[in-house]
Amino acid sequence: RETNENDYVDIHKGDKCYSRVGKSFNGGPQPLSLGKGCTDFGTILHELGHSVGFNHEHSRSDRDEYLIVHKENVLSGYERDFEKLWENKTRTIGDFDYDSIMLYGLLCLFKGSV
């Protein structure tokens, strides 16, 4: 849909599921891609969460107090999704939320077999 707004979330069918975290510094359209397998309610909410400024719950600076990330089990090319954010570069809201829509599931991007 067309808009006269300068800053907006541009939701489109893409190759992957992604959105920038928060508003772009320079403004303008912010892409939110919903690729194959990305159109379930939870994934759409997750990507919208990124678009309004929420980081992954498992990337919190204090995440090691709540969970263990086995980086050797992460699919190649997705290691960045599990990096811990610096405390002075992000803000946490409340306690760690194991039920957060911003927390990847147990086997998300897992390269092994179950």
From Swiss-Prot:
InterPro entries: MetalloPept_cat_dom_sf, Peptidase_M12A, Peptidase_Metallo
One MF term in the entry's GO annotations: toxin activity
GO cellular component, one term: extracellular region
The entry's keywords: Disulfide bond, Glycoprotein, Hydrolase, Metal-binding, Metalloprotease, Protease, Secreted, Toxin, Zinc
Subcellular location: Secreted
Record SMART domains: ZnMc
Pfam families registered for this protein in UniProt: Astacin (PF01400)
Known glycosylation sites: N88
Disulfide bonds: C17-C38
Main subcellular location: secreted
Note on cofactor: Binds 1 zinc ion per subunit.
Required cofactor(s): Zn(2+)
Active site residues according to the UniProt entry: E47
Residue intervals of the Peptidase M12A domain: 1-114
Keyword Zinc belongs to the record: yes
Record's keyword annotation contains Cell membrane: no
Function: Zinc metalloprotease. Provoques deadhesion of endothelial cells from cell cultures, and also degradation of fibronectin, fibrinogen and gelatin in vitro. Its role in the venom is not fully understood but it might act as a spreading factor that facilitates diffusion of other venom toxins. Alternatively, it might be involved in the proteolytic processing of other venom toxins or it might play a role in extra-oral digestion of prey.
Subunit structure: Monomer.
Protein name: Astacin-like metalloprotease toxin 4
Source organism (scientific name): Loxosceles laeta (South American recluse spider)
Lineage: Eukaryota, Metazoa, Ecdysozoa, Arthropoda, Chelicerata
